[in-house]
C-alpha cells in the first residue's frame, strides 16, 4: 500500500484495485463482478464508471437502495484506514459526468442505472422505491371519521384524561409536528403523571387517535416505549361494533413470535384495566383482537421454486388491516411486494424504530428511519420517545 493515494487513471488500475479491495474485504466478490460485467456489457472503459458500479453494489449489499454521489469521499472513496486511491474528478462536475455514461438514464428512461437528484440507482430498485412511495402517499392522504363511541372509548382507554376540551381525535399533522419538536418528553412514570396533570398531551392517546383516523399509520419508538400497548388499544377501538379481518406480520419467525407474545400479554393487561368500564365499553372487542403473527413471506404465500408469491395485485390479500412489526427490517423489494398485495381499502400500520423510507431521503432499502414520518404530514405518524404503558 502506498504512502499517499494514487490517482485512478485507467480501467486496468481500477480492476486491480477491485481485486485488492475484495481481498481486504472492503468489497465482496459480487461487488467486483458486478462492476466488471457492467463495464463489459456497456463497453464503458471509464475508471470512474467501474468504481461507481462497485460502490453502488456495495450500497445494495449494505441494505441501501442507492448511491448518493454527494456521499463519495474523493480522496478516499472506500473509507480505507489508509487511503490507497483518490478520484481525479471534479466533485462539482461529478453528476454531469455520471449522467453522460451510456448506461445511465434519467427517471423514466429504460436504462440499467438511473440518476435522480444526485442519487445513482439500479433501475430495479428505483422502480421499487417509486412504487412504494406512490402507494404510501396515497394511503397517507386517506382519512376516516371517528364516531362518538370511539371518542368515549378513548377517554376510558386513557385515564386520567389529558384535558376536557371535547376533542378526542387529534389532527395527525398537529400530532406529528408536536411529537417531533417536544424536547421535554420524559421516560419515567412519575414525570409522565406530572405531564398529564399539567395538561400536556398524552402521546399514547394521540398515537391511537390519529392512527384510528388514517389509512396509514406509523408508530415508532425504541424497546419498551409502549408501541404494542398503543396498538392493542387501537385494535380494540377498531373492533368496537365491527368485524375486521386483521393480520399481524413481522420480518422473521423470531420477530413474529415476539409480537404474538406481546399482543397476548397486552390483551390480558387491557382486559384487567378496563374491568371498571364494563358498563360503558364492549369488552368483547378485546377478544376480537388477533394474537397470532406470521412472517411476511408466509402471509404473501411462498411458491416453491419461484421468486413470486401467491398474493399480488391480481390476487390480493383478504384483510382489512395489516400490522407490520419491525417494519424497518423489511427490505425495499419485499415492502413493494407487500403493498402490491394489499387491498386498496385496507389499513396499514407500521411499527418499529424510526423508519427511513425512500423517496423522502436516500434511504436504506431495509427501509424504512425518519422520513415516512417526515413525508406524511397528512398521514398519522407518531414517534414514541416514551409512550407510557397505561
Where in the sequence are the language-model features?
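Conserved ATP-binding/catalytic motifs of P-loop helicase motor domains
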Residues: 2-182, 186-390
Amino acid at each position: 500500500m502506498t504512502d499517499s493515494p494514487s490517482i485512478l487513471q485507467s480501467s486496468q488500475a481500477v480492476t486491480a484495485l477491485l481485486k485488492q479491495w475484495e481481498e481486504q474485504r472492503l468489497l465482496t466478490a459480487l461487488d467486483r463482478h458486478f462492476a466488471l460485467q457492467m463495464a463489459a456489457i456497456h463497453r464503458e472503459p471509464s475508471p470512474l464508471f467501474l468504481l461507481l458500479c462497485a460502490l453502488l453494489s456495495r450500497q445494495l449489499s449494505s441494505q441501501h437502495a442507492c448511491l448518493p454521489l454527494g456521499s463519495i469521499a474523493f480522496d478516499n472513496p472506500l473509507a480505507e484506514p489508509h487511503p490507497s486511491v483518490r478520484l481525479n474528478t471534479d466533485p462539482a462536475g461529478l453528476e454531469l459526468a455520471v449522467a453522460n455514461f451510456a448506461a445511465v438514464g434519467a427517471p423514466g428512461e429504460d436504462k440499467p442505472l438511473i440518476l435522480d437528484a444526485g442519487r445513482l440507482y439500479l433501475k430495479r430498485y428505483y422502480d421499487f422505491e417509486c412504487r412504494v412511495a406512490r402507494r404510501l402517499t396515497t394511503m397517507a392522504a386517506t382519512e376516516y371519521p371517528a364516531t362518538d363511541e370511539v371518542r368515549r372509548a378513548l377517554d376510558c382507554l386513557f385515564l386520567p384524561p389529558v384535558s376536557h376540551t371535547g376533542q378526542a381525535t387529534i389532527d395527525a399533522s398537529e400530532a406529528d409536528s408536536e411529537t417531533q419538536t417536544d424536547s421535554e418528553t420524559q421516560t419515567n412514570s412519575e414525570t409522565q403523571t406530572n405531564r398529564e396533570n399539567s395538561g400536556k398531551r398524552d402521546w399514547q392517546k394521540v398515537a391511537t387517535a390519529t392512527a384510528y383516523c388514517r389509512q396509514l399509520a406509523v408508530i415508532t419508538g425504541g424497546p419498551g416505549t409502549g408501541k404494542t400497548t398503543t396498538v392493542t388499544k387501537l385494535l380494540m377501538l377498531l373492533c368496537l361494533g365491527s368485524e375486521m379481518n386483521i393480520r399481524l406480520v413481522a420480518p422473521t419467525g423470531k420477530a413474529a413470535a415476539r409480537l404474538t407474545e406481546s399482543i397476548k400479554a397486552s390483551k390480558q393487561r387491557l382486559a384487567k384495566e378496563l374491568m371498571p368500564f364494563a358498563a360503558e365499553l364492549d369488552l368483547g372487542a378485546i377478544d376480537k383482537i388477533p394474537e397470532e403473527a406470521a412472517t411476511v413471506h408466509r402471509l404473501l404465500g411462498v411458491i416453491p421454486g419461484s421468486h413470486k408469491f401467491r398474493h399480488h395485485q391480481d390476487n390480493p390479500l383478504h384483510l382489512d388491516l395489516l400490522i407490520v412489526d419491525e417494519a424497518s427490517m423489511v427490505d425495499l423489494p419485499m415492502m413493494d411486494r407487500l403493498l402490491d398485495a394489499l387491498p386498496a381499502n385496507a389499513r396499514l400500520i407500521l411499527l418499529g424504530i424510526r423508519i427511513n423510507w425512500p423517496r423522502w431521503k436516500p434511504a436504506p432499502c431495509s427501509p424504512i428511519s425518519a422520513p415516512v414520518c417526515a413525508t406524511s404530514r397528512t398521514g398519522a405518524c407518531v414517534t414514541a420517545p416514551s409512550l407510557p404503558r397505561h
